[in-house]
């Protein structure tokens, strides 16, 4: 860990506050099943329910709410789609304009989303569509800006990246808290107004505990970040201004010494462009792999409430119990994700120092193979359990789902950082 301007206390403050931010705000849309329970109780989309006659002797009329379930699933589907579709333009904004601009956009989207939910009613249930999309995009952008915090901790970088992704998974339990508080008499509007007010905390963290541009890797000497009252921000830009002319900065230093002009061999690759990275087979296969895995998880989360309702034969108490159990398991995401980080960083903890340059990068890639295999195995086991139409088996499904998701997102972020 490089010594310098930002002390251990400040780095730990950034790490822990980022962990809280990811764990309480970034991925709350994935706790959708708990919020749906509340929204159904409030009567959102209830006009889509149609009365049907049961085969009982007295021809009791029970509502058929399949259209209501489809509408709730559509809200989640659009929100989760935006979570992935907007990642690319948001990543461009983050790279082009830096951390502060990206986080201000994220905070604006997040605040707008919470306010839309707060002021929605059963008559204005359509507001859920833009609200969930804004919460989803704002949350993923906050997560993207927090990934770079791993650069502050050197050899623990992959562990911290996976830890943040685990906290992102665990944030889905926030909707469980909302569900429990709602059952104890707190209104949905009051809770979402409180979440909107928390944007002030995000703003303070943006100003004082995050860089204006990016956290470089490896860290330059005396690196500092954030505003310093009443002085000037000692960010990477300040370091760049102080650097003697002609000296290479940390992001400009090549991994290996450059060959003299004309000495490059025929087989030596030139500098890799962004287009070459996007068109590479490794990236294409990784995107395809991630898309299939994510689709499985999104399908499960988006259809969980009607699935539990079907398996419980309409028993709302059972549905509530299993919904709570699912949300509680999501809290464990932050505990499961570092296991994947340990797998990814296992070759860095030996007595032999990690090789530098391209050889070290290749060692990192090889270490990620086991992580990818374990992730796929967990997803297969989760899918098998989810296919069993028995309620008690769903407890095992919930556990395997949170393990699989934690390994998927944490391993994906770390793999992209390595590759």
Task: Mark where each language-model region is.
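Conserved MFS/SLC helix-loop-helix module at the cytosolic interface between two early adjacent transmembrane helices
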Residues: 8, 85-126
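Long, low-complexity inter-transmembrane loops of multi-pass membrane transporters
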Residues: 210-284, 288, 299, 303, ...
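Hydrophobic core of transmembrane alpha-helices in multi-pass small-molecule transporters
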Residues: 113, 124-142, 291, 383, ...
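C-terminal transmembrane helical hairpin of 12-TM major facilitator-type secondary transporters
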Residues: 344, 351-412
């Amino acid at each position: 860990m490089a010594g310098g301007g930002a002390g251990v206390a400040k780095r730990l403050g950034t790490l822990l506050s980022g962990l809280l931010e990811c764990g309480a705000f970034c991925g709350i849309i994935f706790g959708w099943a708990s919020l749906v329970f509340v929204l159904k109780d409030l009567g959102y989309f209830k006009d889509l329910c149609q009365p049907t006659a049961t085969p009982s002797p007295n021809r009791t009329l029970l509502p058929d709410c399949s259209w209501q379930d489809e509408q709730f699933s559509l809200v989640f589907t659009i929100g989760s789609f935006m979570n992935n579709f907007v990642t690319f333009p948001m990543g461009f904004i983050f790279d082009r304009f830096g951390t502060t601009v990206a986080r201000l956009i994220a905070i604006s989207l997040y605040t707008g989303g919470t306010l839309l939910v707060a002021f929605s009613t059963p008559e204005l249930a359509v507001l859920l569509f833009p609200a969930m999309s804004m919460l989803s995009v704002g949350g993923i952008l906050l997560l993207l800006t927090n990934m770079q915090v791993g650069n502050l901790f050197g050899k623990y970088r992959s562990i911290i990246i996976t830890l943040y992704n685990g906290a992102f998974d665990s944030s889905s339990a926030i909707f469980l808290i909302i569900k429990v508080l709602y059952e104890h008499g707190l209104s949905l509007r009051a809770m979402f107004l409180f979440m909107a007010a928390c944007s002030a905390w995000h703003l303070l963290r943006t100003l004082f505990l995050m860089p204006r541009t990016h956290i470089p890797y490896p860290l330059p000497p005396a690196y500092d970040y954030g505003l310093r009252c009443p002085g000037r921000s000692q960010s990477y830009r300040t370091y760049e201004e102080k650097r003697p002319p002609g000296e290479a900065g940390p992001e400009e230093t090549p991994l290996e010494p450059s060959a003299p002009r004309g000495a490059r061999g025929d087989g030596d690759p030139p500098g890799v462009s962004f287009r070459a990275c996007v068109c590479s087979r490794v990236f294409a296969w990784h995107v395809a792999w991630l898309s299939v895995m994510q689709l499985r998880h999104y399908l499960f989360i988006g259809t969980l409430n009607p699935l539990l309702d079907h398996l419980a034969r309409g028993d709302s108490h059972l549905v509530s119990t299993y919904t709570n159990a699912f949300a509680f398991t999501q809290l464990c995401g932050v505990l499961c994700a570092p296991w994947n980080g340990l797998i990814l960083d296992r070759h860095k903890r030996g007595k032999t120092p990690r090789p530098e340059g391209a050889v070290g990068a290749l060692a990192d890639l090889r270490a990620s193979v086991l992580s990818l295999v374990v992730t796929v195995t967990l997803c297969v086991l989760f899918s098998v359990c989810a296919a069993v139409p028995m309620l008690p088996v769903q407890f095992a499904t919930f556990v395997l789902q949170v393990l699989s998701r934690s390994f998927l997102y944490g391993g994906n972020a770390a793999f992209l950082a390595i590759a």
